[in-house]
């Protein structure tokens, strides 16, 4: 099992997603959705190669779908680097 690390961009994405969730759905639902990302991060760290390669979007990236958002990550030895969490935004703008 690898460890995972969040990029600053991914941390900012989580904050943005949580704030949006609180405004749109309330704190309870926003917290549940926020916590689901960490469940996905654990799953990614356990089986990183089970997620699709999206090198056609960005070299060496893989994607895990979590709810309505996609987690983009890279495998760097024993570290999974969570690079960004993208929802309906333009991929070219975010990645």
Go through each PLM region and give its residues.
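Basic, Lys/Arg-enriched alpha-helical interface segments
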Residues: 1-57, 61
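Enriched for short, Lys/Arg-rich terminal
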Residues: 66-95
């Amino acid at each position: 099992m690898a460890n995972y690390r969040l990029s600053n961009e991914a941390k900012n994405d989580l904050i943005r997603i949580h704030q949006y969730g609180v405004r749109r759905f309330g704190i309870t639902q926003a917290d549940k959705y926020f916590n689901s990302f960490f469940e996905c991060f654990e799953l990614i760290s356990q089986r990183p190669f089970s997620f699709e390669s999206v090198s056609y979007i960005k070299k060496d990236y893989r994607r895990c779908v979590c709810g309505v958002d996609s987690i983009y990550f890279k495998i760097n030895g024993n570290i999974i680097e969570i690079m960004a969490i993208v929802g309906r935004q333009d991929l070219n703008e975010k990645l």
